[in-house]
Design a protein with these regions (language model features):
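A short acidic-Thr-Gly-centered motif at the start of a beta-strand
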Residues: 1-2, 55-58, 428-444, 614-617
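Short amphipathic alpha-helices in soluble, non-transmembrane regions
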Residues: 644-652
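Conserved catalytic core of nucleic-acid polymerases
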Residues: 203, 207, 328-332, 336, ...
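Active-site-proximal helix-loop-helix substrate-binding element of RNase H-like nuclease domains
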Residues: 24-180, 279, 478, 483-490, ...
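Long, low-complexity, intrinsically disordered segments
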Residues: 714-736
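Helix N-cap motif at beta-to-alpha junctions
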Residues: 636-642
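Short active-site loop/helix that positions an aromatic residue
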Residues: 70-82, 99-101, 251-258, 451-466
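Conserved "right-hand" nucleotidyltransferase catalytic core of DNA-directed polymerases
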Residues: 1-17, 21-33, 40, 117, ...
Length: 736
């Protein structure tokens, strides 16, 4: 295997606002740096590197090494007019490797060069040149001007840029030589290989994009805008003009309507010379120190949150204090705390809070998805279709490694948000957002996700007698409704009814899984303390495996009666990814049960998508998007397409080997929103997946045919068998 360090420098004018400019056919690759590790030869090639880089990308005997390699791969394939999924070279990204070794450290090339090579990234010269011309901000934004001599004195700095790109190609190879043994020693290579395969998959998904029904989107934007206007007018008529994003204005409104809320005191200190300090300067473990004095001695509840020293105290607490004459003075800012938990705690009992929550949700959805902000990400392709080419980060979440989306963040589309619910003006904004995401022309949208994934993983990892119990229940019934089971076992369904009892069971169990304390549950779900205690005790007694497993994980991390003799400060997900408990952060150990579940869920999704991408069905079915535990695919309405979905379903069900079975249920339709699953009667499916695919496929084909045939409804009956013929469908696709 030949290793090539690789880096590009590009003119990327849209990167900050809209993502890589190649998506919008703007910008260019200025220079490509290559370091041949075998020959120890460095080169800077103009543009995208010509045949040299083309041959490297298409050789299975080569591996390219870089930092943020997916970005470079996208630009190079755009410049060479290549499909990313067709490239054959291996990929190594030292930033992704570092995310596995130490998820708390910065992953930039400069930080990695300092850590492993004891040197800096070679950017000082170019940064200085940019400043010399008064070019503000990151000098990389001005590389085009420096490359082409678009400076006041018309001087080109190509040699300096070539030296810079060569350095960026060379350093990752030398960093990888240090990282590779660490990954091997810690058993992280499987996780690393998985994530590197996902780089190619996510970049290919970005390159293809997802088709957007532009007319439907414009229609929904107009409807949402009119609804927002009505909502805003109604809000102003009740409460006046209020900036709902201003804590002070919301607090004033709460005071007017006597809505309770907390205040948060923020301590800000000054060193003797008047310099404002950072909390990190005086942070020892989880204690805050002022010079040699531990502040906890004076303020028992003081703690550090996001690098700010804070103390939760009653509203009437004094607004200023001092420690002693020889010590620094501390100014205490009495800030209202009116975040999402504050609203959750009072929205059930105070209409003003409920109205603000609704207004914020609607504003957020419309701003991000049903207005111009979303429209700026859309691109019209060569056949006139509008497409979205979003960004997908393979390891977006530092602790768990879960994928993330940006520009736009599709994870911000809620599952359900209804406006004017129960009235004739009712709108489902979540549905309106999703229904504009459609399959490729002449195809159907198939959504596939894991059924009860988090519940299954909790059962898989569960310890003790409770763990054996829940696993036996899943073995007896692979489609166990665990929330229903726990609701019945706890007596909540008998006490509160089937719907409310199941909902309470689900809320408490997920609250436990996400590490919520009792007070947080009260605020999140609008419960009083006694009711929350009653629910929590009932659920913990009925489902002891969650608490038992959480306790076992914390004991292992903290060395308290270490479970099965194990004592270590990290947990491992299914693939072997390590999630570390930092020194001095013992209080955060309660979160690691959730990290274990979320990280393993991420592993499952990635491994399922890798099975898909490495199979022949990737030539039939196209991955359009992935959000949380679901993937959206474009599938031909043909027997081949139907068969491919059945195979895809097996990939999801067999992504990892669990101690209990897991199911993945496809939903099929015209769009992301309209995708529907198998019909059920009395809890059992009354059609197979094959029947579902054929039924919905025929309905979609009939709908398409109706748009292009005579408007006389009674004239001709549609021949479903003819419409479903594979040859006819292929011809139709070629014509389009």
């Amino acid at each position: 295997m030949k290793y090539f360090g690789l880096d590009i420098e590009s003119h990327d004018p849209l990167l900050t606002d809209q993502g890589p400019s190649w998506v919008y056919s703007q910008g260019e690759v200025l220079v490509t740096g290559i370091y041949d590790a075998q020959k120890q030869k460095k080169r800077a090639l103009n543009g995208a590197g010509g045949d040299t880089v083309h041959d490297i990308l298409f050789s299975s005997a080569t591996t390219i090494v870089g930092a943020n390699i997916g970005y470079d791969l996208g630009w190079l394939c755009y410049a060479h007019k290549l499909k990313i999924k067709d490239t054959r070279c291996g990929l190594i990204d030292v930033a992704i490797a570092e995310s596995l070794i130490d998820e708390y450290q910065p992953f930039s090339l400069d930080a990695l060069a300092q850590k492993y090579l004891r040197e800096r990234k070679g950017s000082e010269d170019l940064a200085g040149i940019a400043l010399q011309y008064g070019l503000k901000g990151d000098f990389r934004k001005h590389l085009k001007a420096l490359w082409y001599g678009e400076t006041p004195d018309k001087v080109s700095y190509k040699d300096e840029i070539r030296a810079y790109v060569i350095s960026d190609a060379d350093q990752p190879v030398r960093i990888w030589e240090k990282q590779h043994p660490i990954l091997e020693e810690q058993g992280l290579m499987d996780a690393f290989i998985m994530n590197m395969k996902m780089v190619r998959i996510t970049q290919a998904m970005k390159q293809h994009g997802v088709r957007i029904d532009y007319e439907k989107w414009q229609e929904n934007c107009a409807i949402a805008s009119a609804a927002y206007k009505d909502l805003h007018e109604d809000f102003v008529s009740k409460y006046g003009e209020v900036n709902i994003n201003s804590p002070k204005q919301v607090a004033a409104l709460f005071d007017k309507f006597e809505v309770p809320y907390k205040h948060k005191l923020v301590f800000k200190g000054w060193a003797p010379e008047g310099r404002k300090f950072s909390a990190n300067d005086w942070l020892k473990g989880d204690e805050v120190w002022d010079q040699r004095k531990r502040l906890k001695e004076s303020f028992p509840n003081i703690r550090v949150v996001k690098n700010k020293i804070v103390l939760m105290v009653p509203k009437q607490y004094a607004a200023r204090t001092a420690l002693q004459a020889s010590s620094m003075g501390y100014q205490i800012t009495n800030n209202p705390s009116v975040g999402k938990f504050a609203f959750a705690a009072v929205k059930a009992t105070h209409q003003v809070a409920a109205d603000i929550v609704e207004f914020k949700q609607v504003t957020n959805i419309i701003t991000k998805f049903l207005g111009p902000n979303f429209g700026r990400f859309l691109v019209q392709d060569t056949v006139g279709d509008w497409r979205l080419h979003g960004n997908f980060d393979t390891v977006g979440a530092r602790q768990t490694g879960r994928m993330s989306a940006s520009k736009p963040n599709l994870q911000n589309i809620p599952s359900k948000t209804k406006l004017f619910e129960g009235t004739e003006k009712e709108l489902d904004l979540a549905f309106m957002c999703r229904e504009v995401f459609v399959a490729d022309r002449g195809q159907m949208f198939v959504k596939l996700d894991f059924s009860g994934q988090e519940n299954v993983l909790q059962a898989h990892f569960a310890v003790g007698a409770g763990g054996r119990l829940i696993r036996s229940m899943y073995m007896a019934n692979p489609r166990l409704d665990e929330h229903q089971f726990v609701g019945e076992r706890s007596g909540l369904i008998e006490q509160h009814g089937p719907k409310a009892g199941r909902k309470y069971a689900k809320s408490v169990r997920f609250g436990n899984a996400y590490g919520m304390q009792l007070q947080t549950m009260c605020e999140q779900f609008g419960w009083d303390k006694d009711f929350a205690e009653e629910l929590t005790n009932a659920i913990n007694d009925a489902a002891p495996w969650v608490r038992e497993t959480m306790d076992a994980i914390q004991d292992m991390l903290l060395g308290k009666n270490a479970y099965r003799g194990k004592q270590r400060r990290y947990i491992k997900t299914i693939i072997g990814r390590r999630i570390h408990l930092r020194e001095g952060n013992d209080r955060g150990a309660y979160k690691f049960y959730n990290y274990l579940i979320q990280g393993s869920a991420s592993d499952m999704m990635k491994l399922a998508l890798i099975k898909y991408a490495e199979s022949d069905i990737a030539n039939i079915v196209t991955l359009l998007l992935t959000v949380h535990d679901e993937g959206g695919f474009s599938v031909p309405i043909t027997p081949q397409g139907f068969a491919a979905v059945l195979i895809l379903q097996t990939f999801f069900c067999s992504a990892v080997e669990l101690s209990i079975p897991i199911n993945a249920d496809p939903e099929v339709g015209h769009s992301w929103a309209s995708a529907e699953g198998q019909h059920k009667t009395d809890g059992a499916f009354d059609e197979t997946v094959q029947e579902l695919l054929e039924r919905v496929g025929h309905e979609l084909l009939a709908g398409n045919a109706a748009k292009t045939t005579s408007t006389d409804d009674d004239e001709d009956e549609i021949d479903f068998d003819a419409l479903g013929d594979e040859d006819d469908t292929e011809e139709e696709g070629e014509d389009e």
